[in-house]
């Protein structure tokens, strides 16, 4: 009986994960990425910042993926690196900011400074109205679902 309950829980979790992937794929298919691709192609310098360990791991994946097309991202880690870099950025640069909630205080503060400097920014956050997405030039939303 207990094993059957665990199996049902596992099956539901697997179904939720699969549904989440399907939603992500559908959202990406429906999103016009031409503007983002153009900025990645034309930017003088490219940067990526993630608010936590998982988000930083995503910035590392972005960095590796774009090496194949000779576009090199600098991944920023921590407050000092982020804030020092912002002071040197201009309209010719691009920054990708990754945050689950889009409400991380440091990311929001950085996005405000980047916007004031005219830097093109792309946020990647969960599908919700959030401060980071409102501050960035373009937003990509990732459907997320919490499971117990």
Q: Where in the sequence are the language-model features?
A:
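HTH-adjacent hinge/linker in prokaryotic transcriptional regulators
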Residues: 1-31
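Short, flexible segments with low predicted structural confidence
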Residues: 10-12, 37, 85-86
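Alpha-helical scaffold segments in soluble metabolic enzymes
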Residues: 20, 35, 109, 113
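Glycine-rich phosphate/diphosphate-binding loops that line cofactor/substrate pockets in enzymes
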Residues: 31-44
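Glycine-rich phosphate-binding loops that contact phosphosugars or nucleotide phosphates
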Residues: 41-148
């Amino acid at each position: 009986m207990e094993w059957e309950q665990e199996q049902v829980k596992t099956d539901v979790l697997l179904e939720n994960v699969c549904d989440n992937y399907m939603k992500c794929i559908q959202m990406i298919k429906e999103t016009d990425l031409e503007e983002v691709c153009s900025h990645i192609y034309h930017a003088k310098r490219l940067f990526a910042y993630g608010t936590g360990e998982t988000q930083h791991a995503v910035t590392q994946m972005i960095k590796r993926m774009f090496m194949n097309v000779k576009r090199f991202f600098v991944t920023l880690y921590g407050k000092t690196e982020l804030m020092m870099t912002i002071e040197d950025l201009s309209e010719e640069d691009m920054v990708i900011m990754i945050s689950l909630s889009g409400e991380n205080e440091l990311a929001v503060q950085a996005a405000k400074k980047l916007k004031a400097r005219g830097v093109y920014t792309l946020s990647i956050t969960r599908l919700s109205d959030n401060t980071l997405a409102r501050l960035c030039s373009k937003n990509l939303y990732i459907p997320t679902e919490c499971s117990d």
